Curated annotation (Swiss-Prot):
Disulfide bonds: none annotated. This is Superoxide dismutase [Mn], mitochondrial. Mn(2+) binds at H26, H74, D159, H163. InterPro entries: Fe/Mn_Superoxide_Dismutase (IPR050265), Mn/Fe_SOD (IPR001189), Mn/Fe_SOD_BS (IPR019833), Mn/Fe_SOD_C (IPR019832), Mn/Fe_SOD_N (IPR019831), Mn/Fe_SOD_N_sf (IPR036324), SOD_C_sf (IPR036314). The gene is SOD2. Belongs to the iron/manganese superoxide dismutase family. It catalyses: 2 superoxide + 2 H(+) = H2O2 + O2. Its cofactor is Mn(2+). Keywords: Acetylation, Manganese, Metal-binding, Mitochondrion, Nitration, Oxidoreductase, Ubl conjugation.
Amino acid sequence: KHSLPDLPYDYGALEPHINAQIMQLHHSKHHAAYVNNLNDTEEKYKEALAKGDVTAQIALQPALKFNGGGHINHSIFWTNLSPNGGGEPKGELLEAIKRDFGSFDKFKERLTAASVGVQGSGWGWLGFNKERGHLQIAACPNQDPLQGTTGLIPLLGIDVWEHAYYLQYKNVRPDYLKAIWNVINWENVTERYMACKK
């Protein structure tokens, strides 16, 4: 069974950039719903497998992708944020960003543009392309998980579902994007980068 991970900080810790009300609803209601629905879907899937019911297995795929993706994405997202975040990464990750995007500012512009440009709900991502050995920006619709749908290893995810910002930023997604850079946990992103290079 999957369970809701604890946040590594208090709900109000990311103020004023992301307010406590958003964090509480986002974590304790939205993420919790993905976890519960994923567990329910997996139970139904096991039953369908046991019965050899391929039609039922196929019918469950969208729910598995949506709720499984929601759980994977949010579990990464919470650790990608920190009250002590912001600034720029250091060391090898910064060098890789400069190599693959020209500069940190250009990278920031591109990931912001990809995230703002998601139509409807979805995610902006910095991922690692293991085959080519470099960083890549991608956007995924809904809760589609980055690795499961593109093969890129997720390093940094930006949630652009309205539930991630609407209570504070209303319909002005670019303002939310501007604010979130102040709480990006570059240590966590760097750890993810170093792990996938091994």
